[in-house]
From Swiss-Prot:
It comes from Streptococcus pyogenes serotype M1. Pathway: Carbohydrate metabolism; nucleotide-sugar metabolism. Belongs to the UDPGP type 2 family. The keyword Acetylation does not apply. It is an enzyme of class 2 (transferase). This is UTP--glucose-1-phosphate uridylyltransferase 1. Keywords: Nucleotidyltransferase, Transferase. The gene is hasC1. InterPro entries: GalU_uridylyltTrfase_bac/arc, NTP_transferase_dom, Nucleotide-diphossugar_trans.
Length: 304
């Protein structure tokens, strides 16, 4: 059996929801306190046992490559000043086996994954979406990517991460139609549906940003016609794959943080900061003070 060694991180999106910040800075480089969002993804991959990572980028994404490259001047300066803890943090971002390829035009997630065909070869691989951060406030939790890899060791089949979402939100996700009940959190899947209307959704089990796929997906993606949004949808290709190979779905029970929009990004930043040793106490005190001020502002005043 071929071991899962490789991961793909699609990072070619334009990041329009975060303009003007993303005009010159990659969305994936926006920090949660002091760490870019893409670094959380890379750390999850490494913690799971992934050996090689391909980042699929687009225009104005050079900052991602720079972040994971060495910076001699910075490293020399930190070493000379004896700032060893900071030097260690910098070193952790450079000792990684990362590769980069550019998606020339944003034609959808399926097309971004297809750019990795030569990198992956004939091996199973993981796709990790940068908008979904998993259990970042729980260092002891088993990474979701690791859970998918363990499932593959048992089934030798593609496995997609899913999570229950409010029924009214299903139109924002790909959704699975499960076959029967889950066995230890693992579902057999009948069909995959991309962004159904709530009244048409086969379940509340939404696909979240982790996929373990067999290499046969590439042949399907090469023939895939554009779907929702006139883009090549990975969900559609997985549904086609499911007709010739079994595809499973792993239900994620941990905490998922969606950093794909402003409010989700702010919530994630607050939750992570409340666990950050350098800022958590000050932030807690500030939130308590702010909460009292907001409650006071709600009290109606009565004029005589």
């Amino acid at each position: 059996m071929t071991k899962v060694r490789k991961a793909i991180i699609p990072a070619a999106g334009l990041g329009t929801r975060f303009l003007p910040a993303t005009k010159a800075l990659a969305k994936e480089m926006l920090p949660i306190v002091d760490k870019p969002t893409i670094q959380f993804i890379v750390e999850e991959a490494l913690k799971s046992g992934i050996e090689e990572i391909l980042v699929v980028t687009g225009k104005a994404k050079r900052s991602i490559e720079d972040h994971f490259d060495s910076n001699f001047e910075l490293e020399y300066n930190l070493q000379a000043k004896g700032k060893n803890e900071l030097l260690k943090l910098v070193d952790e971002t450079t000792a990684i086996n990362l590769h980069f390829i550019r998606q020339s035009h944003p034609r959808g997630l399926g097309d971004a994954v297809l750019q990795a065909k030569a990198f992956v070869g004939n091996e199973p691989f993981v796709v990790m979406l940068g908008d979904d951060l998993m259990d970042i406030t729980n260092a002891s939790a088993k990474p979701l990517t690791k859970q998918l890899m363990e499932d593959y060791d048992k089934t030798h089949a593609s496995t997609i991460a899913v999570m229950k979402v409010p029924h009214e939100d299903v139109s924002s996700y790909g959704v699975i139609a499960p076959q029967g009940k889950a066995v230890k959190g693992l579902y057999s899947v009948d069909t995959f549906v991309e962004k159904p209307q709530p009244e048409d959704a086969p379940s509340d089990l939404a696909i979240i940003g982790r996929y373990l796929l067999t290499p046969e997906i590439f042949g399907i993606l090469e023939r895939q016609t554009p779907g929702a949004g006139n883009e090549v949808q990975l969900t559609d290709a997985i549904d086609t794959l499911n007709k010739t190979q079994r595809v499973f779905a792993r239900e994620f029970k941990g905490n998922r943080y969606d950093v794909g929009d402003k409010f989700g990004f702010m919530k994630t930043s607050i939750d992570y900061a409340l666990e950050h040793p350098q800022v958590k106490e000050d932030l807690k005190n500030y939130i308590i003070k702010l909460g009292k001020a907001l409650e006071k502002s709600k009290v109606p005043t009565h004029s005589k």
